[in-house]
Amino acid sequence: MSYVKDTHMVHNKSKLGNVLIVSAHDPSGAGLQADIETCQALKCYPATIVTGLTTQNTRKLSNVKNISAHDFRAQLETLLEEFSPDVCKVGLINSTDLMASLSNVITEKLPDIPLVIDPILGSGSGAKLFTEEIIEGYLQHLVPIAEIITPNLREVRLLSNGRDVVSSVDYLLGNGCKNILVTDTDPEKEIIINHLFSRVCRQETYEMKRYQGEYHGTGCTLSSAVACRLAAGMDIRSAVRSAQKYAHSAVQFAHDLGWCQKIPNRFF
């Protein structure tokens, strides 16, 4: 009997970039869902650690229920028994206990991988998601070990006690962070202006068309795209440039579901 090889059963064994995602669930499409979609679109494998459950839609956020520190640590340690991430991306983490636990695990078990932090201090609908304790948690546990953080204008000021952008960046870089991508530094303009600051390289400025309307999960999309590009082996500046182009296109082709905010189309 002759054997005919079924070519449809031949699997692509090229290595996927592995991204460890640490964030909260948002039933309306930001948070972990946005992270997962972005990773899939950019050919990376997302392994997710849940920090909390949010009660929200694109119009309002009414509650965040944090996972216990015990359950959080158990998720991490069990996953890392067999999963070897190339990058870790952190989204909403609304507990200093979880921040401390994550910092310990990263330092002890994953000291060589880049850490991408999207410091979510408010929801897209305007809800406040921080206390002074949370701000201090970022500064003590996460910012010092970050490869890059991606705050918007409001967040970078909150993290630095209300300083102007340049002073805020100097403060955060002095706190240990290697790179800072400050997004939408002039919200009143018709274009979006982002700035990348680094401890070792000159500042870069990026300008993009501002699309009309409000969008849900753009920050999650951008920061996860940065993580994916780093997982693919890009240097930080190339990763940031590529991620911004991707996120901008996802907004350009966003889904208008008739909700308060549009949903970025991550598979445009």
What are these regions (language model features)?
Residues 43-45, 202-204, 229-243:
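Phosphate-handling active-site elements
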